[in-house]
A protein has these predicted regions:
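Active-site catalytic motif of lipid deacylating hydrolases and related acyltransferases
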Residues: 2-57
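Catalytic histidine-centered segment of alpha/beta-hydrolase-like enzymes
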Residues: 43-44, 144-156
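Short beta-strand/loop motif that positions the catalytic acidic residue
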Residues: 107-109, 113-120
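Active-site nucleophile loop of the alpha/beta-hydrolase fold
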Residues: 13-14, 34-39, 81-93, 117
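Gly/Ala-rich beta-loop-alpha elbow adjacent to hydrolase catalytic centers
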Residues: 63-72
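Conserved alpha/beta-hydrolase "acid-adjacent" motif
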Residues: 120-127, 149
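Conserved alpha/beta-hydrolase fold motif
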Residues: 61-62, 83
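Catalytic histidine neighborhood in serine/cysteine hydrolases
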Residues: 133-149
Length: 167
């Protein structure tokens, strides 16, 4: 597997951090992940935080897992940055100020790919497939779990995005 040269911003999930196995599995020279305390920050604060980070880092690609997948979709659409989402939380219910991902967030021409391990014990990935399949490429694998059994699978999707959409 070759090394990835694109600048990647990884958005971790709820109760996770930059110590995430998903972040460390990404084989990229320029990868960034900033810890966010989602539980204690309201939606607008997190949105402004990610907008500021994107302006500073200027990533070529967003990669998000779980709640980070939710934010990757939001930021991808707002900033027109390609994204890869892994077992995304499309309707976060841990706070009342989060609105579910809907057609407005998905119906655009920005390259996005979903990597789904269907054995997720926290989120129903079959419902995620139904919601996303009309809008983006999906790579779904049987088994796995919410934290991802094979986070290294993200690398070939990142390579594909880099070769196809990132000059």
């Amino acid at each position: 597997m070759k090394n990835i040269h694109s600048k990647i911003l990884f958005l971790h999930g709820l109760d996770s951090s930059k110590e995430s196995t998903k972040f460390h599995a990404i084989n990229a020279e320029k990868k960034y992940c900033i810890d966010v305390d989602y539980r204690n920050l309201n939606y607008k604060t997190v949105e402004c935080f990610y907008q500021d980070i994107i302006e500073k880092i200027k990533p070529d690609l967003l990669v998000g897992h779980s709640l980070g997948g939710y934010w990757a979709l939001k930021m991808s659409q707002q900033h027109r940055i390609p994204a890869i989402i892994a077992n995304p939380s499309l309707d976060p219910d841990f706070r009342e100020d989060y609105v579910a991902i809907d057609e407005h967030d998905l119906d655009h021409d920005i390259p996005q790919i979903a990597y789904l391990e269907l054995g997720d014990e926290v989120l129903d990935m079959y419902k995620v497939v139904e919601q996303l399949e009309s809008y983006m490429q999906i790579e779904a694998v049987e088994g796995g779990h919410h934290r991802l059994v094979q986070p290294e699978n993200l690398n070939h999707l990142i390579e594909y995005m880099e070769q196809t959409f990132i000059a």
